[in-house]
Amino acid sequence: VIEPIPFAGLIELDVGFIPASLDRAIAIAASAHAGQVDKAGEPYILHPLRVMLSVPPEARIAAVLHDVLEDSDISSDDLLAEGFSPENLAVLDAVSRRPGESYHSFIVRCSKNPLARIVKLADLRDNCDMSRLANPSLADWARYEKYMEAIVYLRGDELC
């Protein structure tokens, strides 16, 4: 059971009003990522929120939840029980790398779902913002190059 974080039915942000299902998705993501930090030491929840704000409305639920299945104990069944649609769960499955799956296979699989492609592109773009890292390491730059190749592929350009 996912612990609820109380929110009003609607939250007013600079992007307008957010329906309750997105409100619930934000609460679940905040709970799932509580205490996690990113590579820059910032609260991890800021990443899915940035991704959510960079996609069209129809992709926002999946965008804010995009790392929940991989990075928490929350399952697809839990999200289904919370009332999220099978369509949203299909997007979440497509943007979640499976155990033993190569990165290339994951990106190819993700590319087959139009909303997953949008969410993953936004995720990768946010992950490629090296300005958030004070002193990027060689590993950070290698990850950046890998993500840029995935962006090229997901945009429909040639696979590098």
Report residues per predicted region.
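Active-site helical microenvironments for divalent-metal-assisted chemistry
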Residues: 2-160
